[in-house]
């Protein structure tokens, strides 16, 4: 472990000396002369035309005479090269060591390696100035990377294979931002106090990620330091919240406060300005509308993250919100008359787990699983007040600000001049409560018109939609309702009531039907009830192996009844008639007269011819009255007599059989083993 001494610029907390303070210093002081020379060197020439941002300095970030960005007077190209050399060596060296559990002392270990310009037996030669590269808590950060599914080779390929890209609009923090060419990681320079606070935060951060990796908090993948020329430049590697391949039409930095929370005129002149709270409330008074499941998942994630930040006494953090307007991009493409560059190079999903906004609130990805790739690029589907389809990319940023003495003093001073509840700097408990209330009530709102449907990942997961184009996404009207009475299986087929659900089977299956067969084929029920399910032909039904059998009884030549076992024709259904026990039932005729049905104990079933086209219709329970009654007469034998029942005419009458004991028209008689008591069933196949 090494003890670091902060450089003289960092010890001042302000980070840099302004030009006015430098010119007012005493001319005889050596420090004042040094600062004057530095400022004069960075000042633009009088005869030349200054470039954009030339000669201006914000914190440690500045621009040299050639127009290149500098950080602590180190050029951006030098800093990028040193970062890639250092990370390439440390990560490669760490991957050769065996993995082990994270120990408490691992959070405070600092490894250091010297990189001379001429090279050494461990480091390659380079054309930069000699520098020392430090890695903070390498074992702990290796665990974090594994937790998010980032392999060492992928980490090295993203950071070291191609040059880093500097962001042109870094913000007002005075930091320099780099993004990898694959949009996977962001590299940000941090202050000494911020790096120190992150080191203290690591044990609690480790515990929080173990409990729940789905969070909107920054995902830290590494903390490093480049030491050169007496300067310590500390950088942190994080997840990229706003991918460059997705065009952001709006960008907001939201804190939940109102004091000076409006974008300046200078900021609005930028190509992609960063708007603030008052701008959001003015431009989007209706907020961002989400469906109920998405809103619930987002609110729970925000609530959990706010509690974590409050427990660490963190404040002054923000919600970075990027809005991609799908409808606006389609209008822009139609106006241009050609496809944009986004179509030429199809976006590739991020490799890290839980790195997108959609995964952070929804989950669904586990360690080692492949992430579903769709054209939403991890954005959260939403709708604005005008009904336009949006994709939201969100994340909580700037969490390395603790409520120290300087922040307490800042809040006290601002509270004396303005309303203390409106300023951004506040105690952590109040800040977290105000932040959560603003996000859950003003920014994000639940819309009753937007409904989600349970997907294959279970209830609460977002609706999985395969878009047709790079900017296609589901709209509000295309999302089916979640509270539907009709159940859908994975194939989208509707499930009808099965034989076991009715409780009174009339047909005995040869073999127990599978789950798919049970949901795709229904079985006949009793005629006394109002439901009549028409079986559908299943792929397992064949003429050689029918699914159902039935018994028939007929009179032989000697006058004795005979039983026969037949394979059930799939073009027929068997209906069983069950009179009420002990009560005579009168079936009215057309003129109102009736015939008394014999008492209980009589029961039979008949074969009813069904048209083949009717098998594709809905169950007869959805119809009623005479229109749904079978048109074919039903013959049955009860109490020593033959009876004929006409469902269409609702008439029951006794008939006289022929000398052979069978009906005159040659119809077959169906035997029901549940109610026929003259002869017990003896065939073993009837019990299958």
Swiss-Prot record:
Positions of the PIPK domain: 75-443
InterPro entries in alphabetical order: PInositol-4-P-4/5-kinase_C_sf (IPR027483), PInositol-4-P-4/5-kinase_core (IPR002498), PInositol-4-P-5-kinase_N (IPR027484), PInositol-4/5-P-5/4-kinase (IPR023610)
First-level EC class: transferase
Region (Disordered): 48-71, 525-565, 592-629
Modification type Phosphotyrosine: residues: 635, 671
PTM sites of type N6-acetyllysine: 265, 268
GO cellular component, one term: uropod
Residues recorded as bearing Phosphoserine in the entry: 554, 672, 682, 686
Asymmetric dimethylarginine PTM positions: 459
Topological relation to the membrane, as annotated: Peripheral membrane protein
Keyword Transferase: yes
Reactions listed under catalytic activity: a 1,2-diacyl-sn-glycero-3-phospho-(1D-myo-inositol 4-phosphate) + ATP = a 1,2-diacyl-sn-glycero-3-phospho-(1D-myo-inositol-4,5-bisphosphate) + ADP + H(+); 1-octadecanoyl-2-(5Z,8Z,11Z,14Z)-eicosatetraenoyl-sn-glycero-3-phospho-1D-myo-inositol 4-phosphate + ATP = 1-octadecanoyl-2-(5Z,8Z,11Z,14Z)-eicosatetraenoyl-sn-glycero-3-phospho-1D-myo-inositol 4,5-bisphosphate + ADP + H(+); 1-octadecanoyl-2-(9Z)-octadecenoyl-sn-glycero-3-phospho-1D-myo-inositol 4-phosphate + ATP = 1-octadecanoyl-2-(9Z)-octadecenoyl-sn-glycero-3-phospho-1D-myo-inositol 4,5-bisphosphate + ADP + H(+); 1-octadecanoyl-2-(9Z)-octadecenoyl-sn-glycero-3-phospho-1D-myo-inositol + ATP = 1-octadecanoyl-2-(9Z)-octadecenoyl-sn-glycero-3-phospho-1D-myo-inositol 5-phosphate + ADP + H(+)
UniProt modification remark: Phosphorylation on Ser-672 negatively regulates binding to TLN2 and is strongly stimulated in mitosis. Phosphorylation on Tyr-671 is necessary for targeting to focal adhesions. Phosphorylation on Ser-672 and Tyr-671 are mutually exclusive. Phosphorylated by SYK and CSK. Tyrosine phosphorylation is enhanced by PTK2 signaling. Phosphorylated at Tyr-635 upon EGF stimulation.
Extent of Low complexity compositional bias: 525-534, 602-623
Quaternary state and interactors: Interacts with TLN1. Interacts with TLN2; interaction stimulates 1-phosphatidylinositol-4-phosphate 5-kinase activity. May compete with beta-integrins for the same binding site on TLN1 and TLN2. Interacts with ARF6; interaction stimulates 1-phosphatidylinositol-4-phosphate 5-kinase activity. Interacts with AP2B1. Interacts with AP2M1; phosphorylation of PIP5K1C by CSK disrupts the interaction; clathrin competes with PIP5K1C. Interacts with CDH1. Interacts with CSK. Interacts with PLCG1; interaction is abolished upon EGF stimulation.
Reported function: Catalyzes the phosphorylation of phosphatidylinositol 4-phosphate (PtdIns(4)P/PI4P) to form phosphatidylinositol 4,5-bisphosphate (PtdIns(4,5)P2/PIP2), a lipid second messenger that regulates several cellular processes such as signal transduction, vesicle trafficking, actin cytoskeleton dynamics, cell adhesion, and cell motility. PtdIns(4,5)P2 can directly act as a second messenger or can be utilized as a precursor to generate other second messengers: inositol 1,4,5-trisphosphate (IP3), diacylglycerol (DAG) or phosphatidylinositol-3,4,5-trisphosphate (PtdIns(3,4,5)P3/PIP3).
Protein name: Phosphatidylinositol 4-phosphate 5-kinase type-1 gamma
Native source organism of the sequence: Rattus norvegicus (Rat)
Gene transcribed to yield this protein: Pip5k1c
């Amino acid at each position: 472990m090494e003890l670091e001494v902060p450089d003289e610029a960092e010890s001042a907390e302000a980070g840099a000396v302004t030009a006015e303070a430098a010119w007012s210093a005493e001319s005889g002081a050596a420090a004042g002369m040094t600062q004057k020379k530095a400022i004069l060197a960075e000042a633009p020439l009088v005869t030349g035309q200054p470039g954009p941002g030339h000669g201006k300095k914000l914190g440690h970030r500045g621009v040299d005479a050639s127009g290149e960005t500098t950080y602590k007077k180190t050029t951006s190209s030098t800093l990028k090269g040193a970062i890639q050399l250092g990370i390439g060596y440390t990560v490669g060296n760490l991957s050769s060591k065996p993995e082990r559990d994270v120990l408490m002392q691992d959070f405070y270990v600092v490894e250091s390696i010297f990189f001379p310009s001429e090279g050494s037996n461990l480091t390659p030669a380079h054309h930069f100035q000699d520098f020392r590269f430090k890695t903070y808590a390498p074992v702990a950060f290796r665990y974090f990377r594994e937790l998010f599914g980032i392999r060492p080779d992928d980490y090295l390929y993203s950071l070291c294979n191609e040059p880093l890209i500097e962001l042109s609009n870094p913000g007002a923090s005075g930091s320099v931002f780099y993004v990898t060419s694959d949009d996977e990681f962001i590299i940000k320079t941090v202050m000494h106090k911020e790096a120190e606070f992150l080191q203290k935060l690591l044990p609690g951060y480790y515990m929080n990620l173990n409990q729940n990796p789905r969070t909107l908090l920054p995902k830290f993948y590494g903390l490093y330091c480049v030491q050169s020329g007496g300067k310590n430049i500390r950088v942190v590697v994080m997840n990229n919240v706003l991918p460059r391949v997705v065009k952001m039409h709006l960008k907001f930095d939201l804190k939940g406060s109102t004091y000076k929370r409006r974008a300046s005129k200078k900021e609005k002149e930028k190509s992609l300005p960063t708007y603030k709270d008052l701008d959001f409330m003015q431009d989007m008074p209706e907020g961002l509308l989400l469906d109920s499941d998405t809103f619930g998942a987002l609110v729970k994630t925000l609530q959990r993250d706010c509690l974590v930040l409050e427990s660490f006494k963190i404040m002054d953090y923000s919600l970075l919100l990027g809005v991609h307007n799908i409808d606006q991009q389609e209008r822009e493409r139609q106006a241009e008359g050609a496809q944009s560059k986004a179509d030429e190079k199809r976006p590739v999903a991020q490799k890290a787990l839980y790195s997108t906004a959609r995964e952070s609130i929804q989950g669904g990805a586990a360690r080692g699983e492949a992430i579903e790739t769709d054209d939403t690029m991890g954005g959260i589907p939403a709708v604005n007040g005008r009904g336009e389809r949006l994709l939201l990319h969100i994340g909580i940023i700037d969490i390395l600000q603790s409520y120290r003495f300087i922040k307490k003093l800042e809040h006290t001073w601002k509270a004396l001049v303005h309303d203390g509840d409106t300023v951004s700097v506040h105690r952590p408990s109040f800040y977290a409560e105000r932040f959560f209330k603003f996000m859950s009530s003003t920014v994000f709102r639940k819309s009753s018109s937007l409904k989600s449907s349970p997907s294959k990942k279970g209830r609460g997961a977002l609706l999985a939609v395969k878009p047709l184009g790079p900017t296609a996404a589901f709209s509000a009207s295309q999302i089916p309702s979640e509270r539907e009475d009709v159940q859908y299986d994975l194939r989208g087929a509707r499930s009808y009531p099965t034989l076991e659900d009715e409780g009174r089977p009339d047909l005995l299956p040869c073999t127990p039907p599978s789950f798919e067969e049970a949901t795709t084929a229904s079985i006949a029920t009793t005629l006394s009830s109002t439901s009549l399910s028409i079986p559908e032909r299943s792929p397992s039904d064949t003429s050689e192996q029918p699914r159902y059998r039935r018994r028939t009884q007929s009179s032989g030549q000697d006058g004795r009844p005979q039983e026969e076992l037949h394979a059930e024709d799939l073009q027929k259904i068997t209906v069983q008639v069950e009179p009420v026990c002990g009560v005579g039932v009168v079936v009215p005729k057309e003129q109102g007269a009736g015939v008394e049905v014999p008492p209980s104990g009589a029961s039979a079933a008949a074969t009813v011819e069904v048209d083949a086209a009717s098998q594709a219709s809905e169950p007869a329970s959805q119809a009623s009255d005479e229109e749904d009654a079978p048109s074919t007469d039903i013959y049955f034998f009860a109490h020593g007599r033959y009876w004929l029942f006409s469902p269409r005419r609702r008439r029951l009458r006794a008939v006289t059989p022929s000398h052979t004991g069978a009906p005159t028209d040659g119809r077959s008689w169906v035997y029901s083993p549940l109610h026929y008591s003259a002869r017990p069933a003896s065939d073993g196949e009837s019990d299958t």
